[in-house]
Amino acid sequence: MKVLSIIEPWATLIASKQKYIETLSWKTSYRGELYIHASKKHIKDKDTKIQELLKLLPSTEMNYGKIICKCQLVDCIYMDEKFINEIKQNQQEYMCGDYQIGRYAWILENTELINPKIDETGKLNIWNFEISK
């Protein structure tokens, strides 16, 4: 299965369907099923923006080091001024990403939680994970 590691709280925002676009500095041609892994990296939760993001979640419990959901990666869009201005119309989505000209918007749909969550060490880029049988 294809997996993308994302720092918390952004991974849990995707899993809880509060965020549908992941903003990255690199593009991908991959389309299809993508699992979201919450990386082990901890951020400073005293940051004002992080505090606002945490208010969107039903719980402040983070999922560090776990594969937590699956979704469909349906598009990867180069961010230009027009695209960014359109996203600004959705204040919550805009607040949840890093929208700058030259970055990429990975469009995610059909997000589903997985149960149980899978403990795993993350990796950079899209990576493969095989479930032990």
Model-derived features: where do they sit?
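Structured alpha/beta reader/binder surfaces that contact nucleic acids or chromatin modification marks
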Residues: M1-K133
